[in-house]
């Protein structure tokens, strides 16, 4: 049995942007499935992001520890579209979230022109939730920007425009400081890779990324430069509570997480939940075995990847929005006592 290590994957995907290639190159994905193996398909978001690495980790642990099943991972694209493909039966797993799944079930927002979305949602179940990771608002250590309130006139990478991360970061800034994107500060148009590169090159004042610490982007940045994470002067009040709603929650980013991190005290930010969806029609026994294979072998990950310590069974099986656990996953969570 191989020992799973993710440090090489994180470094590789930061430079190549290819998740599947990164996994194969580091030698941590199981070798090609034999003729009798069941090969399942997973799609996730940009491969350099922590959430994609979490999902690749899941696939890798299952493939390493469950005979007869291999999970192939492809990175890139939007989770909103991946969910539709799970519903159609073209994918077996994808990323999900309470908000996105609720919208898909109702045929609203990005799904308003997708007449089949509510019906397809019935073929999308939940395997587990995990923390998205606190949103990190990073500046260089010598920046005059000390808090989010100081961002007036700044150039910022919030995430790809129109995406969930962009809207989440924009909303947190506006609810805590009153600063409005496009009026009080500029948000550059870039994808994840070019947005990070803009920060490396000093072309933006603030770089935003939600991730479980330690994050590959900040590990890489602090190899050669110093940074600070910033938060709002005040993270309380009615506007903030309204913004957080049911699915987001305040989170703290500790000091001393990175060798070049110059914060003297923890910083307040926010977090949310994302999850791994699974095709409802995938048989219960298979999903049970997959769920069990991951959680029974999670120690293979946490020993080398400190961020994985944020994954826990209670969070994984919690009720969030309309998403229902796949019966196979629910069986495992009941066995270990986290689901009644």
Where are these regions (language model features)?
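Periplasmic-binding protein-like
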Residues: 168, 294-312
């Amino acid at each position: 049995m191989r020992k799973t290590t993710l440090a090489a994957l994180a470094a590789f995907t930061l430079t190549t942007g290819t998740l599947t290639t990164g996994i194969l190159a580091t030698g941590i994905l199981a070798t090609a499935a034999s003729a009798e193996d069941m090969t399942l398909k997973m799609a996730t978001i940009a491969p350099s992001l922590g959430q994609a690495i979490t999902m690749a980790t899941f696939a890798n642990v299952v493939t390493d520890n469950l005979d007869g099943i291999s999970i192939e991972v492809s990175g890139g694209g939007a989770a909103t579209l991946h969910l539709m493909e799970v519903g159609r039966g073209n994918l077996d797993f994808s990323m999900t979230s309470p908000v996105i799944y609720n919208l898909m079930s109702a045929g609203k927002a990005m799904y308003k022109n997708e007449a089949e979305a509510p019906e397809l949602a019935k073929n999308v179940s939940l395997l587990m939730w995990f923390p998205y990771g606190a949103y990190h608002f990073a500046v260089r250590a010598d920046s005059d920007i000390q808090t989010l309130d100081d961002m007036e006139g700044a150039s910022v990478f919030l995430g790809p425009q129109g995406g969930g991360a962009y809207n989440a970061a924009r909303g947190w800034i506006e609810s805590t400081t009153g600063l409005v994107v496009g009026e009080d500060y500029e948000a550059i148009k870039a994808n994840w890779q070019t947005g990070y590169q803009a920060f490396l090159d000093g072309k933006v004042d603030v770089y935003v990324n939600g991730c479980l610490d330690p994050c590959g982007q900040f590990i890489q940045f602090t190899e050669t430069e110093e940074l600070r994470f910033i938060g709002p002067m005040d993270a309380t009040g009615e506007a903030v509570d309204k913004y957080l709603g049911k699915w987001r929650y305040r989170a703290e980013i500790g000091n001393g997480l990175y060798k070049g991190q110059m914060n003297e005290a923890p910083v307040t930010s926010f977090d949310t939940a994302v999850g791994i969806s699974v095709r409802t029609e995938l048989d219960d026994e298979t999903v049970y075995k997959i769920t069990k294979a991951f959680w029974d072998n999670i120690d293979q990950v946490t020993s080398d990847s400190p961020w994985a310590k944020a994954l826990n069974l209670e969070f994984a099986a919690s009720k969030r929005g309309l998403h229902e656990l796949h019966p196979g996953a629910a069986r495992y969570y009941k066995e270990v006592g986290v689901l009644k």
